[in-house]
Amino acid sequence: AFSFTEQEQKFLWLMFFASFATKVPMLPMHIWLPEAHVEAPTAGSVILAGVLLKLGTYGFIRFSFPLFPFASLYFTPLVYSMASMAVVYTSLTAIRQTDLKRIIAYTSVAHMNLVMIGLFSFNVIGLEGAMLQSLSHGFVASALFLVIGVVYDRHHTRMVKYYGGLVHMMPLFTIIFLIFTMANIALPGTSSFVGELLILVGAYECNTTITFIGATGMVLGGGYSLWLFNRIVYGNLKTQYLKQFCDLEKREFFVFLPLIFGTLFMGVYPEVFLNVMHISINNLLDQIHFV
């Protein structure tokens, strides 16, 4: 086993932190993510949101915690302050965006920083919530980028102002969009609710202030998610061209189906996932608290 002095741990932890925090991404290293999502095709955004962002949080669990347990505990206040600021800041920023993809990109930053709060609570509940929320975010964010891909294929613009009244032309699309909007704001019965609730309970054991700030971010998340859904789906048809929109094709519907199943199954039966995580999380915490 590796053994580093306290000073070595601090230095090496910061080096690892620089790379993992950029990947998560944490404030202020988050600026690349909205730009990447805007430039990427739909498939690229789905892979980025569903898989690649999780490599940052996985890096902390797999490398930073076991290799540098002292430094991980030492720098917890730094991570808490950065993550809590990011949750509120990116939620407020998302409300001001005009590009559909940018809105979802900023929500991704907010949710992944909530995961960081759960990880650095260093208790079983917080870590289980963080891992569950990582999985949930993979389903929900990927589906929301697919939702935007569906309307972009038909209208070839991502500007919010050109959409409205799609419920009249695309009822099935509206139902699917509603499911994932509710999941994005952590409605009970969806996967995000379990993950975010466990994160807040775990964080409450360590720091009530951070828990309050994280919960504020969740409230703001409800604001921009419902605003976006209402803006695209309800109201009058903005242009005559929108009347030519067709509802989801079979191909598109079957792409959404496994994501709907994963989101609802994880929300109703989280213990299937929690039981698998329990032993490994306890082993990880034993290594950290041994310090």
Each model region followed by its residue ranges:
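Hydrophobic transmembrane alpha-helices and their helix-loop junctions in integral membrane proteins
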Residues: 1-197, 201-226, 230
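Cytoplasmic/organellar membrane-interface segments at the starts of transmembrane helices
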Residues: 170, 226-291
